[in-house]
Design a protein with these regions (language model features):
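Membrane-embedded alpha-helical bundles of polytopic integral membrane proteins
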Residues: 1-220
């Protein structure tokens, strides 16, 4: 399980990072679009559709993303959209935690399918908008998620249910523990200090570099 996670992460990083640091935002936008299309195809398979139906689900997700791109939404704040989307996400997650796996089965299949495609579309739009805000901002968000997941995974395996007797969400994911939550939280706190210090050092180093370069240029003149 761990080896598969590592291999998958390395392959994705080899594709994602060059696109992320490319001067133009187009390659990164297309890479993320391909990932979301694959996710929509898989969502179609999980929803019980065959190959053709799942491809249609992926095409619908690509169409939504492409329309948003063509309309220029990747450069617009879209405050109302994010408020509604975020609110529905929180309410839906709270309901699923309460209802558990049996509650998921009570949702109509068509509604589950549409909700999944919309979630993938919003995820694409959010990530692409974050890239337009700057590489440093988006990279900090991605690393935060990676660190939280890694620390939670190892903390859960090492200390799961040693200090608390109640699992995190047994009705949804029986293997998750509160020790994993605290481990992920600790990892994020450490990352915050390290990232802030590194960011401050980098921002200070760049003006210093250009100052020295200007001084040398003045001396040569």
């Amino acid at each position: 399980m761990l080896l598969q996670r590592v291999i998958t992460a390395l392959v994705l990083l080899a594709i994602l990072l060059p696109a992320l640091f490319y001067p133009s935002t187009v390659p990164f936008t297309l890479v993320v679009l391909a990932l979301m299309a694959a996710g929509a195809w898989e969502w179609g398979r999980l929803s019980g559709y065959g190959q053709a139906g799942s491809l249609a689900v992926g095409a619908a997700c690509v169409a939504l993303c492409g329309a948003s791109w063509a309309l220029g939404w990747i450069d617009q704040p879209l405050t109302a959209l994010w408020i509604v989307g975020g609110g529905l996400w929180v309410l839906g997650a709270a309901w699923l935690l309460h209802a558990g796996v049996p509650g998921w089965a009570r949702i109509p299949a068509a509604l589950r399918l549409v909700a999944g495609v919309l979630a993938l579309w919003l995820a694409w739009l959010a990530v692409v908008q974050a890239r337009h805000l700057g590489v440093n901002f988006l990279l900090s968000v991605l690393v935060l998620v990676w660190v939280a997941d890694i620390f939670a995974y190892f903390a859960g395996r090492a200390f799961g249910l040693r200090f608390t007797k109640n699992k995190l969400a047994p009705s949804i994911s029986p293997g998750k523990s509160w020790e994993g939550v605290w481990g992920g939280l600790a990892g994020v706190v450490v990352l915050a200090f390290v990232w802030t210090a590194a960011d401050a050092h980098w921002q200070a180093a760049v003006p210093s570099f250009y100052s020295r370069l200007a001084q040398q240029g003045g001396w040569l003149l």
